[in-house]
């Protein structure tokens, strides 16, 4: 996963 990947 990338540094910032908000999984909703």
From Swiss-Prot:
PROSITE patterns: PYROKININ
Keywords: Amidation, Neuropeptide, Secreted
Modified residues (Leucine amide): 8
Functional note: Myoactive.
Intracellular or extracellular location(s): Secreted
Protein name from the UniProt record: Pyrokinin-3
Family: Belongs to the pyrokinin family.
GO process annotations (BP): neuropeptide signaling pathway
Keyword Nucleotide-binding (UniProt): no
GO cellular component, one term: extracellular region
Organism: Namaquaphasma ookiepense (Gladiator bug)
């Amino acid at each position: 996963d990338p540094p910032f990947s908000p999984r909703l």
